[in-house]
Amino acid sequence: MAELKAVHQDAADAGHRSHVSVKAVWRELSSVVKIGIVNSNLITTFAGMWLAFYFTGEHFLENLHLVFFTLFGAALVIAGSCAINNYIDRDIDQYMERTKARPTVTGTMDPRRVLWLGIGLVAIGEMGLLMTTVTAAVVGLIGMATYVFLYTLWTKRHYTINTVVGSISGAVPPVIGWTAVDPEFHIVPLILFLIMFLWQPPHFLALAMKRCEEYRAAGIPMLPVVHGFAMTKRQIIVWVACLLPLPFYLFSLGVPFLIVATLLNVGWLLLGLAGLKMKDDIKWAKWMFVYSLNYLTILFVAMIIATLW
């Protein structure tokens, strides 16, 4: 009887260890591919695809295969690009609080395996996008190349303009979504690209202000590290102001959308201007960062809702 209990206990312990192991592996993989970035970019990818269905008159439910291959392909290309970024940045990630626990830094994952994982994910993702349109696959490849080569390998470590260069790749997902449905040129994906492109500098510069000393320790020439908070604030305000006219190019989504989008833009701009008088720069940067996250979510959800009226 005692032996039987021991067997059951051993089995239970083995099951528990297996469960813990699976959770640990998933946690490490999620960190390597930056699952949060993947998820947020899939929201904009879906929005671009949804708007393409709306403006071209195609039916969503009749094109579920496109939806699947677009989201599948985009997710893997983004995840793979992030994994390659983790491989490249493993030498500087150790100096930053938010990145020092990544598997490529702690050694819990072989960096070479992370690199090959990234390359494999990008390759499979590109094949997925090719199941939609060649244009979508090309756009995805441009986004990956910009993020890995122009941003991670080149500008991130050498120039304060790194944030702007990185914004190109971050603005690609909604264009992937659109071109997967309609590869022809249209003003809407261009506006979606510009919204995402202009949104990213104030978002990431606010983050850079919050993490200024970490970036300094890592030797990354972010704008607040090189030129200080005053110039960073002014640039953030300029980037936010550039967003103001863009919603009006989407006037066909209706007046309610224009009102929501304009209120979001004006609110962000007013918060930015308030920073010129605030003495607590870090507190202001936190407010700007949180606002930017809510801004993007509300704006793209509003776009989708506007098509349902």
Curated annotation (Swiss-Prot):
Gene Ontology molecular function, alphabetical: protoheme IX farnesyltransferase activity
Superkingdom of the organism of origin: Bacteria
Keywords carried by this UniProt record: Cell membrane, Heme biosynthesis, Membrane, Transferase, Transmembrane, Transmembrane helix
Pathway linked to the protein: Porphyrin-containing compound metabolism; heme O biosynthesis; heme O from protoheme: step 1/1
Pfam families: UbiA (PF01040)
Location in the cell: Cell membrane
Family statement drawn from the similarity comment of this UniProt entry: Belongs to the UbiA prenyltransferase family. Protoheme IX farnesyltransferase subfamily.
Function statement: Converts heme B (protoheme IX) to heme O by substitution of the vinyl group on carbon 2 of heme B porphyrin ring with a hydroxyethyl farnesyl side group.
Name of this chain's protein: Protoheme IX farnesyltransferase
Organism: Geobacillus kaustophilus (strain HTA426)
Higher taxonomy: Bacteria, Bacillati, Bacillota, Bacilli, Bacillales
